[in-house]
Amino acid sequence: MQRLILIETSTALCSAAIAEGGVITSYRESSAPKAHASLTAVFIQEMLQERGISLSDCDAVCVSMGPGSYTGLRVGVSTAKGLCFGAGKPLIAVGTLDTLVAQAQMADQVGHDGSTNTVIPDQNTVIPDLIGDPRFIIPMIDARRMEVYSAVFEIAGQAGNDARQITETAPAIIDENSFAEYLEQGPCLFIGDGAGKCADVIRHPNAHFCQCWPKASAMLSPAIKALNEKRFEDVAYFEPFYLKEFVATVSKKKMW
């Protein structure tokens, strides 16, 4: 039986999961301040105890590679590397945008928040029933102001469960003309913690928005694929995909 540890720390939500036999069997999450540094390792320890297994029983550790929060990604990758080093397990990295696409394809339950074509997570309506089959899924990670990290994925396959990335992952400043060429072709689902702020700017009948955080549970499908294909990272040299170079600034506040 395949067992995976999944770690997602790229946004304000810190989440971790254990998968066994292709099913999520344990899950933890927190959006509390500084949860990434204080809870990631705790979550993993709790879940291993809950399942009655040890790290040596797991086949690999999977972590979000970004883009996303510099601090969050650093904590997640450091934790994953530590687990892999300690137990001699392979490291799998899954892109944050790929996780959001998988999350959309899981048909997570969402409902209206009262504004046109905008949805937020709850227990009422399934995404495909709400918007029909989307032609494109456009995951968005918030990058402050009106900027997001994003890419466009085209949906293919008879069941609509095959997504192909057709643009490079890149930062984008959102305005009323953003993604116009894709909106003219069919329904587009904008999903992620950067999607909600775009709803007031991108006005189009084919534009649908789901404001949510990427979750460790949604990493399972791409993680299993990477495990089966033996697409592992070099534990010693792997670094997160920050996309933007992190720049440390000196506070202008007087220290004394």
Which sequence ranges carry the predicted segments?
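Surface "functional belts" at beta-alpha junctions
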Residues: V23, P90-P214, V247-A248
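Residues at secondary-structure transition points
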Residues: S31-L39, Y70, R74, S78, ...
